[in-house]
From Swiss-Prot:
GO cellular component: a single term: mitochondrial inner membrane
Membrane-spanning parts: 14-54
Function, as annotated: Component of the cytochrome c oxidase, the last enzyme in the mitochondrial electron transport chain which drives oxidative phosphorylation. The respiratory chain contains 3 multisubunit complexes succinate dehydrogenase (complex II, CII), ubiquinol-cytochrome c oxidoreductase (cytochrome b-c1 complex, complex III, CIII) and cytochrome c oxidase (complex IV, CIV), that cooperate to transfer electrons derived from NADH and succinate to molecular oxygen, creating an electrochemical gradient over the inner membrane that drives transmembrane transport and the ATP synthase.
UniProt entry keywords in alphabetical sequence: Membrane, Mitochondrion, Mitochondrion inner membrane, Transmembrane, Transmembrane helix
Membrane association type: Single-pass membrane protein
InterPro entries: Cytochrome_c_oxidase_VIc, Cytochrome_c_oxidase_VIc/VIIs, Cytochrome_c_oxidase_VIc_sf
Subcellular location: Mitochondrion inner membrane
Protein origin, superkingdom: Eukaryota
Protein's recorded name: Cytochrome c oxidase subunit 6C
Matching PANTHER family: CYTOCHROME C OXIDASE SUBUNIT 6C
Residue ranges annotated as Mitochondrial matrix topological domain: 1-13
Organism, scientific name: Nycticebus coucang
Topological region Mitochondrial intermembrane: 55-75
């Protein structure tokens, strides 16, 4: 009998195994995207803000806007 030589296919746990593999993959991808965002977007933005405010003179810009007539309550 040739049918007795064939092994039975595994039918239990297929979904659990597939979900386990995909959850690990999704976790790895999400960590990669988070690291990419941090170093490609957040860090350069933080550096740009720090560079801007290092030389920022709020009194100077206030006086420029006051002279230009932006503020109605300040003469």
């Amino acid at each position: 009998m040739a049918s007795s030589a064939l092994a039975k296919p595994q039918m239990r746990g297929l979904l659990a195994r597939r979900l386990r593999i995909h959850i690990v993959g999704a976790f790895v991808v999400s960590l990669g995207v988070a690291a990419f965002y941090k170093y490609a977007v957040a860090e350069p933005r933080k550096k740009a803000y720090a560079d801007f405010y290092r030389n920022y003179d709020s009194v100077k810009y206030f006086e420029e806007m006051r002279k230009a007539g932006v503020f109605q309550s300040v003469k």
